[in-house]
Amino acid sequence: MSSIDPRAIIDPSARLADDVVVGPWSIVGPDVEIGEGTVIGPHVVLKGPTVIGKHNRIYQFSSVGEDTPDLKYKGEPTRLVIGDHNTIREGVTIHRGTVQDRSETTIGDHNLIMAYAHIGHDSVIGNHCILVNNTALAGHVWVDDWAILSGYTLVHQFCRIGAHSFSGMGTAIGKDVPAYVTVFGNPAEARSMNFEGMRRRGFSAEAIAALRKAYKLVYRQGLTVEQALTELAESAAQFPEVAVFRDSIQASTRGITR
């Protein structure tokens, strides 16, 4: 049975699963759908069209599904889709998409979005990502699975953050970050790979060693990107993890952080 505080405001068109909890002074607007087991804290504003999946928790003073401030936005119908088992901490802001891109901002499953983080319009967050306090993503940013963005990380629009990558505190990212790579600084520079994260997630010693060699080829041998990718072909055929690293470089449209 749902638990809706009498001080909350729920639009009649909103669709809430039977056991959803909504705290006092929260506002659930039109065209908002909330899945089972989700808890909405006090002083949260949800604006639609927004779909929120199962077993999420959204903490106080978050604004989820608001219009984008992009000056191209003229009120067209766009939406926000949030998956399952996400934690959205205090004061987070997440904007819906624009018709000039995907018309949708998307957040996957099992993500931790910490206090005062911002996710801009048309961004895509994968699964098992962590956005630490005050991280800010401009519009059209992609964050692949298991990426960790430390506090005060800033990401320029249209950048892609690769799977299992890691940014240090206060990093300003203006180019794509390949999978597994650790970046730090303003502007961001590649420092190493997220080997500790790989070990925690069960990567084999052989795969980690292969990725270490791959990183040195791209970043330490003085090769052009094209030359390094050619050198990676044999290792990528043997190790899927190296193939992911190579593919994330090949897919870059902004150039990679070096």
From Swiss-Prot:
Q: Which UniProt keywords apply?
A: Acyltransferase, Cytoplasm, Lipid A biosynthesis, Lipid biosynthesis, Lipid metabolism, Repeat, Transferase
The name of this protein is Acyl-[acyl-carrier-protein]--UDP-N-acetylglucosamine O-acyltransferase
Its gene name is lpxA
What enzyme class is recorded for this protein?
transferase
* SUPFAM superfamilies hit by this protein: Trimeric LpxA-like enzymes
Known catalytic reactions: a (3R)-hydroxyacyl-[ACP] + UDP-N-acetyl-alpha-D-glucosamine = a UDP-3-O-[(3R)-3-hydroxyacyl]-N-acetyl-alpha-D-glucosamine + holo-[ACP]
UniProt cross-references to PROSITE patterns, sorted A to Z: HEXAPEP_TRANSFERASES (PS00101)
Q: What is its EC number?
A: 2.3.1.129
